[in-house]
A protein has these predicted regions:
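Ribonuclease/tRNase effector modules and their secretory precursors
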Residues: 1-89
């Protein structure tokens, strides 16, 4: 799986959320759920999982053969609930 992102957006995300897109790749290597995003006209997805003991959400889209990361942040309450519904943790 190949990952890509806009470098300026990566830096902005790091300043805003304290999370680096480089680390977001790890979210796809751990148990996670994927749900469609309803907040954009572009087809986007949320990967919700647990990294280093905390819930994180990666907002991304698929472009050709790559996953393009748009945002990486702590999960919101409703996102954590969706994860719990599936994994029961």
């Amino acid at each position: 799986m190949r990952f890509e992102w806009d470098e300026h957006k990566r830096i902005t995300n790091l300043e805003k959320h304290g999370l680096d897109f480089f680390d977001a790749v790890e979210a796809f290597e751990t148990p996670h759920i994927v749900v469609p995003s309803t907040h954009s006209s572009e087809q986007r997805f949320l990967a919700i999982g647990v990294m280093q003991g905390r819930f994180v959400t990666v907002v991304y889209t698929k472009r050709s053969e790559a996953i393009r990361i748009i945002s990486f942040r702590r999960s919101r309450h409703e996102e954590r609930q969706k994860y719990h519904e599936l994994y029961g943790e």
